[in-house]
């Protein structure tokens, strides 16, 4: 029996999605965060305390890509291009690594910097906010948009990330794209990314996973229209030409 140790609002939602695609029996054990971190019971499973964690036949697996590769190899080889499909396999391998190695670091760094502003004493918060905004505008945002442009261009000629077939690379890419929705996907059309979001969020396995985990990662992931246009600034920020 596969046991997924699920930390709420975390990367493990992609594993629930993949398990539903595979249609294999599994159990979910849900953990609530404590002060934004994994609880002690979770760190007993792995000293890193990072989500996701999967236990399969007594063996503990960590890291999303490694877990997905294990599940596909053991339970669903059709969710990975075959060795004969070299072009598709190379796409698959690229996006399985791109998710956390290229895109997510910039989004996560921005998130941590925003948290640092909120944790700063109020008297110094304005100064820290200006410093953070400078880092984000001059480096992090530029790199994030560069990555999203690359993704959108790839999806212009590919139905899914590994080509014309849904693979484990699609759930793997869902988390950073979800994380980019609010601050980035509303700033440019990104019609191909949003087309992909609509397609995969309509898959029954994605919908079932969203209901099972009861957090917003996959639920908001399907709410693509919400991020199709730049947000309207509040009235006091609207400039008038009159």
UniProtKB/Swiss-Prot annotation:
**Inducers of expression:** By heavy metals such as cadmium and mercury.
For this chain, the family text in UniProt reads: Belongs to the GST superfamily.
Q: State the EC number(s).
A: 2.5.1.18
SUPFAM superfamilies in alphabetical order: GST C-terminal domain-like, Thioredoxin-like
Annotated GST C-terminal domain ranges read: 85-234
Keyword check for Phosphoprotein, yes or no.
yes
A GO CC annotation recorded here is: cytoplasm
* The protein's name in its UniProt record: Glutathione S-transferase 3
Drop me one GO molecular function for this one: glutathione binding
Report the residue ranges that make up the GST N-terminal domain in this protein.
1-79
Q: What is its main location?
A: cytoplasm
Gene it is expressed from: gst3
Short name of any one Pfam family annotated for the protein: GST_N
GO BP terms in the entry: glutathione metabolic process; removal of superoxide radicals
Q: Where in the cell is it found?
A: Cytoplasm
Catalyses which reaction?
RX + glutathione = an S-substituted glutathione + a halide anion + H(+)
According to the UniProt record, list the residues that bear Phosphothreonine. 232
The entry's function note states: May have a role in the detoxification of various heavy metals.
Per UniProt, subunit arrangement is: Interacts with sad1.
Mark the residues carrying the PTM Phosphoserine.
228
Tree of life domain: Eukaryota
Q: Say yes or no: keyword Transferase present.
A: yes
Q: Which enzyme class, named as a word?
A: transferase
Q: Which UniProt keywords apply?
A: Cytoplasm, Phosphoprotein, Transferase
């Amino acid at each position: 029996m596969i046991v997924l140790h699920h930390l709420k609002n975390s990367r493990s939602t992609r594993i629930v999605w993949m398990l539903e695609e595979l249609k294999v029996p599994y159990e979910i054990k849900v953990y609530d965060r404590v002060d934004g971190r994994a609880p002690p019971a979770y760190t007993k499973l792995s000293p890193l305390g990072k989500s996701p964690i999967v236990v399969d036949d007594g063996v503990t697996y960590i890291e999303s890509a490694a877990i997905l590769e294990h599940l596909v190899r053991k339970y669903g080889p059709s969710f990975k291009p075959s060795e004969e499909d070299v072009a598709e396999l190379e796409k698959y391998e690229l996006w399985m690594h791109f998710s956390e190695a290229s895109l997510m670091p910039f989004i996560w760094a921005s998130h941590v910097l925003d948290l640092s502003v909120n944790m700063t004493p109020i008297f110094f918060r304005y100064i820290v906010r200006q410093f953070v905004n400078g880092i984000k505008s001059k480096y992090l945002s530029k790199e994030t948009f560069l990555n999203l442009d690359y993704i959108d261009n790839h999806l212009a000629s590919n139905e899914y990330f590994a080509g014309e077939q849904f693979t484990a690379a699609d759930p793997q890419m869902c988390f950073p794209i979800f994380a980019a929705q609010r601050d980035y996907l509303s700033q440019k059309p990104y019609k191909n990314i949003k087309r992909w979001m609509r397609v995969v969020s309509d898959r029954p396995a994605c919908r079932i996973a969203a209901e099972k985990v009861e957090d917003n990662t996959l639920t908001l992931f399907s709410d693509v229209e919400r991020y199709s246009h730049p947000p309207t600034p509040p009235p006091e920020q609207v400039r008038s030409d009159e």
